[in-house]
Amino acid sequence: MCIRDSRDYLKEKGHDVTDHGAHEYDALDDYPDFIFPCAHAVASDTDSKGIILGGSGQGEAMAANRVKGVRAAVFYNGPDEIIKLSREHNDANILSLGARFMTEEEIYDILEMWLDEPFGGGRHQRRIEKLDH
């Protein structure tokens, strides 16, 4: 799956999209160079969400989570409940996808599910506030 495909898909669904790259494959690229601009943009706008794609999504999420205010969740396959709970309970504001382990159709389904799931608040808000201290 190409990042451009997911960007175009999200635009077609009515989402505002800012693409922080990479725009073409370069084996010499380092993912933090693309993840940090996304993470900083999300951290500075509490209404925004970020979608990052990598082979496994693990390193990308680790990089994003270095930015204060970011709560990046990793998903590369499994029960749909995992993706819903990342929003409902953890208010994940970045979704890091392991594109190597998912089909294009699965990625589209997960993007919709994740973006549509609201944060539950309540006791979960208290826990999230503790993450930033």
Tell me what each language-model feature is.
Residues F34-V74:
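Helix-adjacent hinge/juxtasegments
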Residues D16-L28:
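A short beta-strand-loop structural module common to alpha/beta enzyme folds
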Residues D29-P32, M62-N65, L85, I107:
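Short, well-ordered secondary-structure micro-motifs
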Residues G78-R126:
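Short, glycine-/small-residue-rich phosphate/pyrophosphate-handling segment
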